[in-house]
Amino acid sequence: MQCFKFIKVMMFLFNLLIFLCGAALLAVGIWVSVDGTSFLKVFGSLSSSAMQFVNVGYFLIAAGAVLFILGFLGCYGAHSENKCVLMMFFSILLIIFIAEIAGAVVALVYTTLAEQFLTLLVVPAIEKDYGYQTDFTQVWNTTMEELHCCGFNNYTDFNASRFVKENKVFPPPCCANPGNHTVEPCTEEKAKSMKVQGCFKEILHRIRANAVTVGGVAVGVAALELAAMVVSMYLYCNLK
């Protein structure tokens, strides 16, 4: 009986933390969606890479909403000893766990396919908005300067852009030499000779270089999810 009470309290506290984290992510997501410029000023290049490939605001709102609901179900289920709510909590967590495993497998096996898919989304945005939408341009400039890369794939992503057509030059990072000193004006010939790597490949390279850390975080998250599922099922099975 004492063990049951202890696990019940731990379940409540653990899910209270998830609930608060979800609320925080929701708040940040709404902030980013409403005022992305100030978010970028506060977090700088820390957030710029991610903002190239996902709409950070909507992503945070979605993740925050899931955590918020999950935390609420866990807290309410443990506190009220409601078997139906505990089963809902377990089911949602199981679906998330399976989706994460599937996503990891797809990311590992179909990296090239993911690159092609993202190219179809990102390159047209570069061609249309770079140099004309302030937030978009600032994010890309920060990313290219911090990661020492050019475009999504390489400098050719800018060939059909309004920016190059009207200014006849490429962004300075596309002409950076190994010492990261830019050669200006950055013409197509100079950009071609410099062979600056695309930002997608650079991000992949950095992720692989930190594979142990990334893997450790993934294993830690998976372990927490498994523990939460085991605890919720234990409470479910021991409730009358």
From Swiss-Prot:
CDD domains: uroplakin_I_like_LEL (cd03156). One of its GO terms (cellular component) is vesicle. Belongs to the tetraspanin (TM4SF) family. One of its GO terms (biological process) is protein stabilization. Structural component of specialized membrane microdomains known as tetraspanin-enriched microdomains (TERMs), which act as platforms for receptor clustering and signaling. Participates thereby in diverse biological functions such as cell signal transduction, adhesion, migration and protein trafficking. Regulates neuronal differentiation in response to NGF by facilitating NGF-mediated activation of NTRK1/TRKA receptor tyrosine kinase and subsequent downstream signaling pathways. Plays a role in the inhibition of TNFalpha-induced apoptosis. SUPFAM superfamilies: Tetraspanin (SSF48652). It is a multi-pass membrane protein. Glycans are attached at N154. PANTHER family: TETRASPANIN, TETRASPANIN-1. Gene3D superfamilies: Tetraspanin. This is Tetraspanin-1. Interacts with SLC19A2. Interacts with NTRK1/TRKA. It is found in: Lysosome membrane. Its main location: membrane. Disulfide bonds: none annotated. Keywords: Glycoprotein, Lysosome, Membrane, Transmembrane, Transmembrane helix. The keyword Membrane applies. The chain crosses the membrane at residues 12-32, 53-73, 89-109, 211-231.
